């Protein structure tokens, strides 16, 4: 046992929730962002502007999402070069096979399959890396065979499970928009602020439609909410870094005083059902957009692209293109910016008044 521990340490193979559930998951979301999400935005712009070249570029970028996610995961796991490059093949296979179900239908588990399988393949590759004199053959061979083999065995099952969870969430939101609006908004909003990836969660379970809209609401409540709530401490720099960056910057302060999170959580519990019940706000762009909030305005761009040209996942879930009017635009602006700012500011005033939030509690270093 001691020899195994020594070997794993030498190979930098650390089986931990942080490395797999935070580092790898977050990197996967970045890979998805740099391929599928950017590709969708570029393709939509090309279609709207009549520029075939942009449509072609967007298609190429989207097609590489599996490879991009797997390579990003390998980078997070500190995989050596030969393993990292081999993961491109693993990601392609896992994403393709995870996008099917056990009965051969269309599945939503591509990103989730890539996450699980790329982690295992990367660690297998790291284990054999530089252990033989024919490393240039053995390392990619082990990485690719392990990854593609697991993809063939497990990816369709993962696709089936992810599809089932996503379908239940979407159907429940359609049937109970008030309750699920609160639940989805609060959970995804908290996931965005925690050091895990809300974007990857939304992508893994293909959250589109009303559930996607509730997720956007929750993320915006945290990002815009914390930006406004902490304005007196952090001024304009904090407003920008949190408002269109990430509310995760407040995680250290939340650990020191968890009560500073209450305004954002309460705000998300209000804006979520307003999004689902009043404005019927649907996010039918790439599912990853639902977990991005106002980060680079990706959530809002996702809603817009979903209006004009719904993503493949949204179409599979019954989404359809619409021509947005003043009501839709008003809903998007209110849910994304106005309500989170106003509500979180008001809740913050109350909590400061009763002494739950003190001067400096929200200051960013």
Predicted regions and their residues:
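Pore-lining transmembrane helices
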Residues: 2-365
């Amino acid at each position: 046992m001691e020899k195994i521990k020594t070997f794993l340490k030498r190979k930098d193979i650390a089986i931990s929730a942080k490395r797999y559930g935070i580092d790898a998951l977050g990197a996967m979301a970045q890979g998805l962002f740099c391929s599928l999400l950017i590709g969708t935005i570029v393709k939509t712009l090309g279609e709207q502007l009549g520029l075939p070249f942009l449509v072609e570029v967007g298609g190429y970028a989207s097609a590489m999402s599996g490879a991009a996610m797997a390579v990003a995961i390998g980078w997070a796991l500190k995989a050596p070069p030969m393993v990292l490059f081999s993961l491109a093949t693993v990601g392609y296979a896992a994403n393709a096979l995870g996008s099917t179900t056990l009965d051969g239908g269309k599945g939503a588990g591509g990103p989730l399959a890539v996450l699980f399988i790329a982690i295992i393949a990367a660690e297998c590759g790291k284990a054999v890396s530089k252990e033989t004199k024919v490393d240039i053959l053995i390392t990619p061979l082990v990485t690719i065979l392990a990854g593609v083999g697991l993809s063939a065995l497990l990816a369709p099952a993962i696709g089936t499970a992810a599809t089932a969870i996503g379908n239940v969430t979407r159907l429940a939101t359609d049937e109970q928009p008030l309750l699920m609006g609160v639940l989805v908004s609060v959970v995804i909003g908290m996931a965005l602020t925690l050091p895990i990836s809300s974007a990857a969660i939304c992508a893994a379970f293909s959250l589109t439609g009303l559930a996607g809209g509730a997720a956007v609401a929750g993320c915006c409540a945290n990002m815009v909410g914390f930006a406004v709530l902490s304005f007196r401490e952090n001024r304009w720099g904090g407003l920008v870094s949190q408002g269109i960056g990430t509310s995760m910057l407040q995680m250290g302060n939340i650990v020191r005083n968890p009560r500073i999170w209450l305004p954002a959580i309460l705000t998300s519990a209000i804006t979520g059902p307003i999004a689902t019940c009043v404005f019927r706000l649907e996010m039918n762009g790439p599912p990853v957009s639902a977990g991005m909030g106002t980060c680079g305005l990706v959530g809002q761009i996702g809603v817009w692209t979903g209006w004009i040209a719904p993503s493949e996942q949204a179409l599979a879930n019954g989404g359809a293109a619409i021509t947005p009017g003043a009501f839709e635009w008003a809903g998007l602006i209110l849910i994304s910016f106005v309500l989170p700012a106003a509500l979180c500011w008001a809740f913050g005033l109350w909590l400061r008044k009763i002494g739950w939030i003190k001067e400096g509690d929200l200051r960013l270093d």
